[in-house]
Structures are given as C-alpha cells and as structure tokens.
Amino acid sequence: MSADYSSEKFKATHLFDEILWHFRSNLSLKTNRRGLATAENSFSGKEAVDFLMIEMPRIIPNNVPERDKMQKFLEFMMDMNVISEAFPKKVKQRRPFSESRIYLFMKTLDELKHPKPRSRRSASFSGARKSAKVAQPASPAATMHRPPKARLPRRLSRSNGNIDKAGIDNSSGGVENHGFDDHKDDEIPKKQRTPKILNRSLESICTEEYTEKREVSEMKEKVYDWLPFFKSRRNHTKVNQPTRRSASLDRNHCVLEQEKAEAALRSQKVTTPPIREAPKDVVFMHPQGPLPAVPSRYQNHRTSIAGSNPALLSRGRMYESIMRRSSVVPVADSVQANNECSFWKTELLGRLEQIYDRTLPCEWASKVDGYDIQWNMIEIDHADGIVKSRCQGLQPDYPQTVIQFMDYLVRYPFVTHKKMDTGLEYNVNRIFITLVNRLEDLNAPLQFDECSLIVNLLCKIDSFAAMLDNGPARRWSKVMISSSASSIEEAGLMVDGFSRDLPACGIRASKYRRRALSPFDNRVNLEIQDEKSYEIREQWLIEAIQLVLLSLPTSRRRKLHKFVTFIQSIETNAVFDLADPSNGSSNNREAAIIGLWTGVCSKCRKQQGMLITAVLLANFQSLFAVPVEFIEQVKRLECEEKDRYSGPRYAKITRSRNDWQPPVPDKPQASPAVFKKPLREVACEKTKKGLFTRLLRK
C-alpha cells in the first residue's frame, strides 16, 4: 500500500503549487507609479501574461498556451488572494483582471506554503514584545507611497495598521500595541520619586533612609518573580527581556524545580529504581488492560502545561466513566475474548438486518463491539436490573451538580431520606429548569446513528409515522440534523420556555445547545398524545429496539437506563407539578418529555427526540429486557464452534448434569412481514416477559 501512495496520486495539486511557486519566484518586479502614489515590487498584467505564455510550456510539456486561459488563470489567482490590484478603485466589487492595470503579490513565498501565525488579542503583552508575531494587513494599499497629507483609512486600532512606509514590514518581531502600553519613558518611577512633604516645616528631612528601604523592598520583590501573576512592568528596564509569553502560559514553577533536581541527580549519576505498580492494582482489573508506568514528574497534582500527554497520565475515576481509551495496550488473552465476542456481534447484526429488511448503516455497524453486547446481556445487577459497569470503583455518569438535582427530584418530599444539603432552599420548578438547561450541554446516550435507526424502525408502523408527519413541522420530520447551526439566527428560542431564567448570552454558549435547535421545528409546541398511543404491540419491533439498545457501549447503556428510570420517577410523583402552559405541557409526564428529551437523544429533531423518549417510557419493561432466546442461540453457536475445532486426538470433556444443554433451534424468520398477525390474535396475544422483567417485579 505504501508503494501505491505517492505524489502521482495528487498530480494536479502538486502541479498547481509548482506553477504558483515558479510564477512568484521568477517574475520580474519593478516600481510602478500612478499619480502621486507608487507601488514597489509590482508588475503589469501584460507582463504577467507574457511570462506565463513563455514559462507554461516548460512546466507542462506538450501544451500550447492561450492568452485567454492565462488571463483566466490570473483571475483565479486574484480570487485566491495571491495577487491584487496595486491601485484599486473604491468600489464594493472587485474589478476583473486586465493587462493594462498594475498588480502586486499579497503573499510571500513562505506564506504560499505556510500561513502566517496570528497573535492572540490580549489586554497585556507582559514579556511578549519580542516573541509576538502579528499578521500583516492583507490590504495592498499598505505597500504604497503616500504624500504627507493623504487620507488614511479610518482604523481605530493602533496595534496593526495604517503603515505609511513603502513595502511590507518584514521584521521578525511583532508590532507593539501602544494602546495597551503600561509605562512611559519620560515618567519617573514611583519608587524613585522623593517623598511628598506634607508639612513644610519638615523640609530638612533626610532622604537617605528612604533610599535604603527602597533597596530592601526590591530585594524582597525578586522572591516573587516566578509567580504567574507578575506585572508586565517588571522587566521593562532590563536590556534583555525574556522571550516567553508569560509565566502563566509556561510550565509550572514547581515542575521546573523538580526537573532541575532530577537533572542534578543525573549529573551525580545517582540511579533510582523505577516506579512499578502493584500486580493487583485496580488498573490491571480493567477489561482494556493495564496502563504504562506513570512518570515520576506526574505523581504530584501539578502537571506540566507544555507537552503533557494524556495517555500517560494515571486513569482517574471520572476519566474511566467518560470514555474507554483505545491507546491502552490490551492484554495477551484479549485475542481469544475478541474471537468469542465476534459471535455476539455477528448474530445481533444478522438478526437486526433480518428484522430491518434492508442493509444496516455502515457507520453504526462498524462501531458496534461484541464485548459490549456480551456484557450488556449477561452482566446484569440483580438489585436494580441495570447492567454492571465495566470499570472498577465509582463512576459518576453525570457531573456532581446534575446528580444532586436529579437526587433532589427523585427523593422529594424527603419523607424517608435525609434532605439534600444544598445550602439554599430551592424550588422544585427552579431545580427542574436548571436541570433541563444543564442536560443540553452534556452528551446524550443515544447518538445520531442510534436515533436515526430507531426512527426508521418506528416509521414502519403507521401510527408512529403519522406522529412524525403531522403537526406544523412536517417538512422537517424526516430530516436528521448532523452538523451545528449555520448561523446565530437559527438558534432562536431555547427549549420551550424552560430557559427563561437564563441570560440571553447563554443561547450561544454550547454547540450541543445550538445543534438541538432548528430554525422552525424546535420553536413550535408539539402535541403529546396519551401513553397508550405510544405502546408497541408488534413483537418484531420490540425485539429490534431491544437489540439496538443492547448494542450500545456499556457506559451509555447504563446512562440511558438510569435516566429513563429517573424520568419515570418524575412523571409518577404527584407531590409537585411541573406543568407549564407556555410550552404546552399539562402534567408532569408531558413536561418531562418536552424538557428532558435532550438527555435521551442528541443531534436529532425535537419531534423525533420526543417520540423516542415517549416510546421508551411507555414500553420501559419490554424494551430494556434481555432476550433470553437470543442469548441461548448465541451460546449454542459458540458450543458448535468449539466442538468443530475439537479433534479426535483430544479427549472430550464429559459434561455434568448442571452444565448447559443447547435447546432445539427455532425456525428462522425472514422479514417483518412474517411477524404480522391478524388483529384478533394481536389483541389476545400476551407479551413474553423476559429475564429483565422478572427481575423488575422483584
């Protein structure tokens, strides 16, 4: 594969870059004059066209150049801001290329390959006046000679602009922003002034004691030079100023001191034994395998800002719950585990494709992990019925403030538990509003791929398809949003009246908040039907959504299960009333669906997210159940695969009476049409209760 990957693959791009580079470096430049203004290093349009007519056959052999094509090429270079007019007219639209006009280059040879670094806008440059680089203005008018009293463009900032000297300022250092300058050379420093004599009778006072105290204070002040909040005036009297930006952007002083101590130890050739983690450490119990040894300089809480590698840091509790790092080196026995887990992924995708009756999305299928499926189906906590965590220790699924708000609403009115110590007396509606707005900025358990797959499955039922097609948002119903809002105006209102207590600046605060809002759909109050209309009676649809939820990563499966349980506890709590007429909710159930759907789904329309949330609430026990028949089928295939590879030269292990025996295989079902039954049979049919349902009853 490395032999196929060469520059021949991008021949047009390399050829275009070569033409630009050759044109910029070899075209003869001179000083042109028009009226009272002159432009150095400029050229006429006719000279550029003649140059291309001569040089283009040398770059591209067997090619006859035409003057019209060369003019179009120079027009394209004007669009790419490579060249521009030296004496432009004050018109809004740029004039087309002409051979009679004068042009100059807007980019140097280095800028054609590497863009210029731009400095950050800051209120203080502190020690950065030698190292800061400010981008030069793109206006070609800055390179012209002007008469002394010519009008300059009205630019208020004095940091970078109004350059009235010929040519571009090619100095390596940046332009000082005198608007933020904090000292004057003519002014005497405050410490060097003579003391102000308030009483004229003390004019014979001796100033020698004052000068001695000033020297002592300067000696004390040098102790704090390493602090990150030193003033920018500190080094302005020194000849050689430091080139670093500021101490707050550099590495921590404690880390520097520790590195100096390590360098001193190395110079003395004193070797210390390496740090080894205990073999029974918690990190080694993680299913993804152990981490490399942590360097000694990261053992303290202060870590280096410059050049810190997150993959080498020790795994924290919060970090475990957020993501499973792919940079962790797996253990040696993981190959066999992955081979065994491939049965789970293959069977789940095959069964789901059989029910879906079409090809599954490749983006979603490639992210499914067989280990997650096996863990989600087998490792279930018998206390609450939620799948166990794959990490050791405590893993919070949400930030601590969100957990406190959810705990407050679940345990309200605190009859059997201790009241939450928040320090303030919160109102229930105020807590709920804050929780709604916080959830918009967090990652939801159901991402874009899962949401689109569940919506397509629900649209196979006419009643659910009608819910998406009806209403004022009909033209947006089947459009999944996959990118952030293209403009600020699209943000509009936030989620339905729950955000009235937030300031206006909070609308643009989060990309997830903008992504959840659409220009039309999410502003409209959508009608929520009764709970029975969201119940699923088709067994094939229940099984399909079960498999989609079981294919989630374990952390997201746990998060979704806990959050839907939390919504159920809110909608059944009759002590408080969360209904708000401004968003169309008349009871707690409607208010929870309207406000909390962003905690279930992400990157989808409001109508689709509310439908998925309502379906999960109405069919909670059946959708979060574990299909026992599917587990038995996969285990049977695993046993057949093991028996196939066990040869006659190895003695077969006799199974005891308690070992699992494969049941009789079921007949395969072809498509969702096989599952369709008459209305009488559907009415009389009782839904099969799985293992998870029996656990919930206990």
UniProtKB/Swiss-Prot annotation:
Sequence ranges of Basic residues compositional bias: 146-157
One GO BP annotation of this record: cell division
Limits of the DEP domain: 23-107
PROSITE patterns noted in UniProt: DEP (PS50186)
One GO cellular component term: cell cortex
Coiled coil: none
Composition skew (Basic and acidic residues), residue ranges: 178-188
Gene3D superfamilies: Winged helix-like DNA-binding domain superfamily/Winged helix DNA-binding domain
UniProt keyword list: Cell cycle, Cell division, Cytoplasm, Developmental protein, Mitosis
Start and end residues of each stretch annotated as Disordered: 115-188, 653-672
Location within or outside the cell: Cytoplasm; Cytoplasm, Cell cortex
SMART domains: DEP
Chief localization: cytoplasm
Entry keyword annotation includes Cell cycle: yes
Biological role stated in the UniProt entry: Required for the proper orientation of spindles after the establishment of polarity. May play a role in interactions between the astral microtubules and the cortical cytoskeleton. Required for asymmetric forces on nuclei and spindles. Acts downstream of the PAR signaling as an intermediate that transduces polarity information to the machinery that positions the mitotic spindle, possibly by regulating force generation. Regulates gpr-1/2 asymmetric cortical localization during the first embryonic cell divisions. Acts antagonistically to the gpr-1/2 signaling pathway.
UniProt xrefs under PANTHER family: DEP DOMAIN-CONTAINING, PROTEIN LET-99
Name the record gives this protein: Protein let-99
Species this chain originates from: Caenorhabditis elegans
